[in-house]
From Swiss-Prot:
Family annotation (Gene3D superfamilies): Urate Oxidase
Biological or metabolic pathway of the protein: Cofactor biosynthesis; 7,8-dihydroneopterin triphosphate biosynthesis; 7,8-dihydroneopterin triphosphate from GTP: step 1/1
Site label May be catalytically important, positions: C154
GO molecular function: GTP cyclohydrolase I activity
Highest classification ranks of the organism: Bacteria, Pseudomonadati, Pseudomonadota, Betaproteobacteria, Nitrosomonadales
Protein name: GTP cyclohydrolase FolE2
Organism expressing this protein natively: Nitrosomonas europaea (strain ATCC 19718 / CIP 103999 / KCTC 2705 / NBRC 14298)
Function per UniProt: Converts GTP to 7,8-dihydroneopterin triphosphate.
E.C. code: 3.5.4.16
């Protein structure tokens, strides 16, 4: 019987690439993984996040080691927070032997809200994304992005109509870079308080009357919403930079109204 000879398996990814063109981002995209996220109430939420994970690739390497991205995710089963998110990113850059890295973690986040009159409780979901980036081996930046569904009511429609006004569901998207800790709930409240009215998962008839009249008494253009949110963010010392967007899904048109304000408060 011939004896089997174990030969080393070639590392194709680590071989030399002769084109000498560096790649800015390479990795895995849209991989789902269970996570645990801390909430402001002192508890935590078990949810499923979708990850995009990338590193840079020097010009002399043929490829990156894709399996290592999954191994890194599997090694972080514990609670994920703003602080541990940086740890995951740094371990990825180190493990892949790169100078820069980028991770996006998008997940649904739930808040148990009380209806404004009846007090009945129900969950409402929000879209949250953590975005972390390391450049030049050490420079770390973190962005939190939250999409908040709200109600907007048109001031012009109210002004020119004998009764009623068109209103619609809107998305207020706030992306912030901070210098100190800020809860997801804090960002959500900023958006909801500047809308014509906030949304609820469950409403009884007295609640429905309240939110209808609340929106009617608080009409806002898409421009009003982004300006009002920006004004709050300008006065929040925890926030260094932000992008605030508002998209109104117009009920009387087959298109949306949209506005955006971007500011880096560190630049005078």
């Amino acid at each position: 019987m011939n004896k089997q000879i174990d030969l080393p398996i070639a590392d194709v990814q680590g071989s030399l690439d002769t084109r000498h063109i560096a790649i800015d981002r390479v990795g895995i995209k849209a991989i789902r993984h269970p996570v645990v996220v801390a909430d402001k109430g002192g508890g935590s939420q078990h949810t499923v996040a979708q990850f995009n994970m990338y590193v840079n690739l020097p010009h002399n390497f043929k490829g990156t080691h894709m399996s290592r991205f999954v191994e890194i995710l599997n090694s972080h089963e514990r609670e994920i927070s703003v602080e541990s998110f940086e740890e995951i990113l740094r371990s990825m850059v180190s493990r892949l032997e790169s100078d820069s890295g980028h991770i996006e973690m998008a997940f649904p986040y739930f808040i148990n809200k009380s209806a404004p009159v009846s007090g009945v409780k129900s969950l409402l979901d929000y879209e949250v994304t953590f975005i972390g980036e390391i450049k030049h081996g050490n420079q770390y930046s973190f962005t939190m992005k939250v999409i908040v569904p709200v109600t907007s009511l048109c001031p012009c429609s109210k002004k020119i109509s004998d009764y009623g006004a068109h209103n619609q569901r809107s998305h207020v998207t706030i992306s912030v870079r901070t210098n100190s800790f800020i809860w997801i709930e804090d960002i959500i409240r900023i958006a909801e308080e500047q809308a014509s009215c906030e949304l609820y998962g469950l409403l009884k008839r007295p609640d429905e009357k309240y939110v209808t009249e609340r929106a009617y008494n608080n009409p806002k253009f898409v421009e009003d919403i982004v300006r009002d949110v920006a004004e709050v963010l300008n006065h929040d010392d925890r926030i260094d930079a932000y992008i605030v967007e508002s998209e109104n899904f117009e009920s009387i048109h087959n298109h949306s109204a949209y506005a955006l304000i971007e500011r880096d408060k560190r630049i005078r």
